[in-house]
Amino acid sequence: MSVTPSIDAVRDLRAASCGPVGAPSVTSDLSENIILTSLDDLHNWARLSSLWPLLYGTACCFIEFAALIGSRFDFDRFGLVPRSSPRQADLLIVAGTVTMKMAPALVRLYEQMPEPKYVIAMGACTITGGMFSADSTTAVRGVDKLIPVDLYLPGCPPRPEAIFDAVIKLRKKVGDESVAERIKIAQTHRYFTVPHHMKRVEPIVTGAYLSADTQKAALKPGAGLPMAAELNTPEIDVSPASQSSSTYES
């Protein structure tokens, strides 16, 4: 004997088994296993956590950067891995004076680095030429005349703590970038290429200013002054005959 279910029983069964379809929600269990992010954030996080610098040290500023490699400062915690090849580096740290003769080599290294790449100008000599540019015709007065610079680190020389501060600021810049907008915000000014022939200028400090009329008038009063007694030392005879006689007397 078969029993036919009532209409109310069928409706109750349908309501219990076939609930309304709603929007999926992220539960607490799912949020502990899945990280929701964007492609830009993931890409920037990977790049700022593994900066591979190419060390280009030409003067005393590089000694301060070499101090970071030791255990006292431990720059490995920032993910910095020094590379000896520009094709494996994404950060160029220029530390020291850049001369006209080394300028083509610096530009060649920059051109061989893959995109995206960054440059830190470390020290006063790198940024403005420093004290060497005052009386030198071969010192480049600012590395930004050769290649684009992302971050300037002044000092003579900068302390290792200042280098860490520069790396942290560069990491913030990398973290705020976007792949789609990088072309729009990229530096568009041209820099010197390798075959560029840099023009040499005549030296400025040649000593010719001493022969000017104003300098002659300023030096004339001191020309006739008597020499101090301490400077009037008797002349010493260094002939072989005098040396042999002094040896015989001793």
Swiss-Prot record:
[4Fe-4S] cluster binds at residues 60-61, 125, 156. Residues 240-250 have a biased composition (Polar residues). Keywords: 4Fe-4S, Iron, Iron-sulfur, Membrane, Metal-binding, NAD, NADP, Plastoquinone, Quinone, Thylakoid, Translocase, Transport. Binds 1 [4Fe-4S] cluster. It is a peripheral membrane protein. The keyword Cell membrane does not apply. NDH-1 can be composed of about 15 different subunits; different subcomplexes with different compositions have been identified which probably have different functions. GO terms for biological process: aerobic respiration; electron transport coupled proton transport; photosynthesis, light reaction. Its EC number is 7.1.1.-. It catalyses: a plastoquinone + NADH + (n+1) H(+)(in) = a plastoquinol + NAD(+) + n H(+)(out); a plastoquinone + NADPH + (n+1) H(+)(in) = a plastoquinol + NADP(+) + n H(+)(out). GO terms for molecular function: 4 iron, 4 sulfur cluster binding; iron ion binding; NADH dehydrogenase (ubiquinone) activity; quinone binding. This is NAD(P)H-quinone oxidoreductase subunit K. It comes from the Bacteria. Gene3D superfamilies: 3.40.50.12280. Residues 230-250 are annotated as: Disordered. NDH-1 shuttles electrons from an unknown electron donor, via FMN and iron-sulfur (Fe-S) centers, to quinones in the respiratory and/or the photosynthetic chain. The immediate electron acceptor for the enzyme in this species is believed to be plastoquinone. Couples the redox reaction to proton translocation, and thus conserves the redox energy in a proton gradient. Cyanobacterial NDH-1 also plays a role in inorganic carbon-concentration. It comes from Prochlorococcus marinus (strain MIT 9313). The keyword 4Fe-4S applies. Belongs to the complex I 20 kDa subunit family. GO terms for cellular component: plasma membrane-derived thylakoid membrane; respiratory chain complex I. NCBIfam families: nuoB_fam, PRK06411.1.
